[in-house]
Design a protein with these regions (language model features):
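A C-terminal functional module that forms or caps the active site or interfaces directly
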Residues: 295-325
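Membrane-interfacial loop-to-helix junctions in multi-pass inner-membrane proteins
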Residues: 43-53, 79-88, 111-125
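N-terminal signal-anchor module of multipass membrane proteins
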Residues: 1-59, 63-66
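Alpha-helical transmembrane segments
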Residues: 8-22, 82-95, 122, 126, ...
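Short, highly charged, low-complexity non-transmembrane loops/tails of multi-pass membrane proteins
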Residues: 365-379
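Long, contiguous internal "core" modules enriched in hydrophobic/ aromatic residues
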Residues: 108-288, 308
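Short, membrane-exposed interhelical loops at transmembrane-helix boundaries
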Residues: 245-251, 318-339
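Transmembrane-helix bundle segments that line or gate the permeation/cavity pathway
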Residues: 24-32, 60-108, 124-151, 184-188, ...
């Protein structure tokens, strides 16, 4: 195993975790529609308990995603999470609201009322996907930071800092970051609807979900296709492999997909699976398993996009303030010893995934009903 192989391997692992996180945000997507899917207190409690079975998996994946970045690409972690901390703090705060809501909305002594905590779930369902999508869009559009490794020898060894006082909120001023954020938001709603249709045994909730699935899909396609076409045709942040200098290359991301044609196939298969899962669910009233082809499709498509952003001599975290401060998998990664050690540890990941799959299967063997949420231990 060479150092270059380990760099690419760990970008693949980080990309896979990011792709899984996007899929698991069906929790946020469903929670954003608590009041539109459930018209009565009982129906809303069914929706909340359905997502309540999975919210910890989503949150754990988010933390693991950040942890993998910290361990494998620490300069990115310190630059983004340390520099753009207002953006990340808002995201994390919305997930804290989610955890608090699940824990206390139906507890005795709740002076705020159940609806207040349910609105917290709605807030997380909107803010989480929107801002996470905007943050990921900066991988293609750039952020405003400066890296100066010469500061390693100074009294205060801070080698990266944000170039303005917004500390990450300036990402929301780029309309294309918002376009992708909205695409992720509506994708989360699509997945959330498909999950509820599959997980909840209630015809009223399922029929409302089918209606909202059409609108969310159309809106998602508008935002996603606009971002995709613009990204493939715009200049990208390329790395000169001989000098390490960052240069602008016309249609860089399109060239990446052509050069790494297996990724193009993976992306296309992912899109087809997503559309199949959505389309069949809309057309057939008896088909309730659309979450699985759609979910697999989302993981494949997002994985391909993330790999396109970091492989093939591409700067995965470009700097708009100083082009040469842009981060690549080569200049931001951990030492070869660290990456190699973590490689062996990562071989245990399939066993963890298998355990999660088993627990998921055990929880979902029986569809959720109104009778089940009357239990005292329900959310």
């Amino acid at each position: 195993m060479t150092y270059i192989f380990l760099q690419h391997y760990w970008w693949f692992i980080v990309s896979l975790l990011g792709a899984l996180l996007v899929f698991l945000m069906f929790v946020q997507g469903a929670n954003s529609m608590v009041f539109s899917l459930g018209h009565s207190d009982e129906e809303r409690r069914v929706v909340v308990n359905s997502t309540g079975r999975k919210w910890e998996i989503t949150f754990t994946t988010l933390v693991t995603f950040g942890g993998a970045f910290f361990a494998s690409f620490p300069l990115f972690y310190s630059t983004s999470f340390g520099g753009a901390y207002w953006l990340w703090m808002i995201i994390l705060f919305s997930f804290v609201l989610q955890a608090v809501s699940y824990e206390f909305q139906n507890k005795l002594g709740n002076i705020l009322g159940t609806r207040t905590f349910q609105w917290m779930l709605v807030a997380n369902g909107i803010i989480g996907p929107l801002l996470l999508g905007g943050a990921v869009a900066t991988f293609f559009n750039g952020s405003n930071f400066v890296v100066d490794k010469g500061n390693l020898t100074s009294f205060q060894p801070v080698i990266s800092h944000w170039a303005n006082a917004s500390y990450g909120l300036d990402a929301l001023l780029d309309p294309w970051n918002l376009v992708f954020g909205l695409a992720v938001f509506f994708l989360a709603r699509i997945l959330g609807t498909l999950y509820i249709i599959n997980n909840v045994d209630d015809e009223n909730i399922r029929s409302r979900g089918s209606v909202r699935l059409v609108g969310c899909t159309i809106t998602f396609l508008i935002f996603f296709l606009a971002f995709l076409v613009r990204t493939l045709l715009k200049e990208g942040f390329a790395v000169d492999p001989s000098t390490g200098l960052i240069v602008m290359e016309p249609m860089k991301y399109l060239h990446n997909l052509i050069a790494m044609w297996p990724l193009l196939i993976v992306f296309a298969v992912g899109v087809v699976l997503l559309l199949y899962g959505v389309g069949r669910t809309i057309v057939s009233k008896t088909y309730i398993k659309g979450i699985w082809p759609a979910g697999i499709g989302v993981v494949l498509a997002v994985l391909a996009l993330m790999l396109c952003a970091g492989w093939n001599n591409t700067a995965f975290y470009p700097s708009n303030a100083d082009l040469q401060s842009s981060l690549t998998i080569a200049n931001s990664c951990s030492s070869e010893f660290t990456l190699r050690t973590m490689f062996y540890v990562s071989l245990l990941v399939p066993f963890v995934v298998a355990y999660i799959a088993y627990v998921w299967y055990a929880m979902d063997k029986k569809k959720l009903t109104k009778e089940e949420v009357s239990d005292e231990e329900a959310y």
